[in-house]
Amino acid sequence: MNPKVEYKQIQSHDEAENQVLQHECHQAKARKYYRCAVVIAIIITLLFCVLASQLLLFPLFSITSQTTTEIVLNKDIQCDDQCRFVLVESIPEGLVYDANATINPSIFQSWLNILTSAKSSVDIASFYWTLTNEDTQTQEPSAHQGELILQELLNLKQRGVSVRVAVNPPDSPLRAKDISALKDSGADVRVVDLPKLTDGVLHTKFWVVDSEHFYIGSANMDWRSLTQVKELGATIYNCSCLAEDLKKIFEAYWILGLPNATLPSPWPVNYSTPYNKDTPMQVMLNSTASQVYISSSPPPLSATGRTDDLQSIINIIDDAKKFVYISVMDYSPTEEFSHPRRYWPYIDNHLRKAVYERNVNVRLLISCWQNSRPSMFTFLRSLAALHSNKSHYNIEVKIFVVPATEVQKKIPYARVNHNKYMVTDRVAYIGTSNWSGDYFIHTAGSALIVNQTQSVGTSDTIQMQLQAVFERDWNSNYSRTFNTLSSWKEKCIF
């Protein structure tokens, strides 16, 4: 019996052809899918490369920018310059001290010195300009020194020295004449509209000469600041490290003097500084190792690294171990020019804390003249009230009065102690601001802070020089004990 055999039906020609066509179609589809997959893979690869570049390359640029900032801020705080520091004053005509009293070089002479030595540039940050007596419409002989300074400035362009002036908007045509003369001589002048930018004024008073020498202090560009107003400042010679740091503040004013200027936030890195209260510059001043930095106000004008002026003052008060001596024209724990009125107790609180918690000896020598605000004496009386034989809180307040003849009394905005400094057992602070809230919140100011306590055994430090000036004035016949509010007007008149 034959075995059962399964037979397959033989496909027809058409059926075979269909199978071939179907096979080729499948292959075509496969090739199409393959090509699509390759294209998709390429696109994904490209997208990955773009993403990688964003993750790797762009942060690299960011890191480069950040590194630039860090280089500026981590710059070596050691300065190799051998700087010469000179404490300078203007003593008003008719104000005479005892024969053995401390006397410092004049601001007029120091200004003349750095002007005559200028080789390439003079940059001046200023509140206003009245170096001639045209603003008073008089022929006051004591204006001669101011007129000499203005003439030296007008001659600088002829010597190939560039002059830049940053100034607050003039408040009267009479205060614009010096500015016009400077422009006519070839000086570059920019009006910094801080009233618009910060609701304050450009109250700073400093010079930078050849990026090597500088002056900073209380004296305005005013003939009275040389002969009719008591002023104090510092002139530093051969000190490019500090001069260049102060110049950064000037450059900030300069850029804000452009038309339609706005406040940068943050400031570009080239305005930053590595020198501040935490990392002061290590520099030799008068052959003495010193820690120095420059503070600034208001905060919106301070670039990265710059200590705000208020923070500097508070830090110095808190750092004092034995005494805090303050000599300023105005002192008030308020915002004097705000509407509505605002209480502003920051400095006041730290003074009280120093007296109460650390038994620090605090003395305030405040100016008293015809433009003094009556409210100031209310707050001064509050501070003075802390001192008594029972409390043993060591705080004293005196007022300083510059004498005036009948002729001198007719000179407007003169015959006043315009100083703006503080000295402790550790630090010397020389500033440009009055001590009320407005000057630290809205108004542009700056200060030089010097600490030489590391130089053990050094005689005649800058701190000692400033202390000697304070004690001379405190013990002089022009200083009067502050007792009651009712008597302050009588005490302000000689």
From Swiss-Prot:
The active site is at residues 203, 205, 210, 418, 420, 425. Its EC number is 3.1.16.1. This is 5'-3' exonuclease PLD3. It is an enzyme of class 3 (hydrolase). SUPFAM superfamilies: Phospholipase D/nuclease. The chain crosses the membrane at residues 38-58. Residues 198-225, 413-439 form the PLD phosphodiesterase domain. Belongs to the phospholipase D family. N-glycosylated. Proteolytically processed to a soluble form that is stable within endosomes and lysosomes. During transport through the secretory pathway becomes proteolysed by cysteine proteases, thereby releasing a stable soluble lysosomal lumenal polypeptide, whereas the transmembrane-bound fragment is rapidly degraded. Its transport route to lysosomes involves ubiquitination and the ESCRT complex. Residues 1-37 are cytoplasmic. One of its GO terms (biological process) is immune system process. PROSITE patterns: PLD. Gene3D superfamilies: Endonuclease Chain A (3.30.870.10). Glycans are attached at residues 100, 238, 260, 270, 286, 389, 434, 451, 477. It is found in: Endoplasmic reticulum membrane; Lysosome lumen; Early endosome membrane; Late endosome membrane.
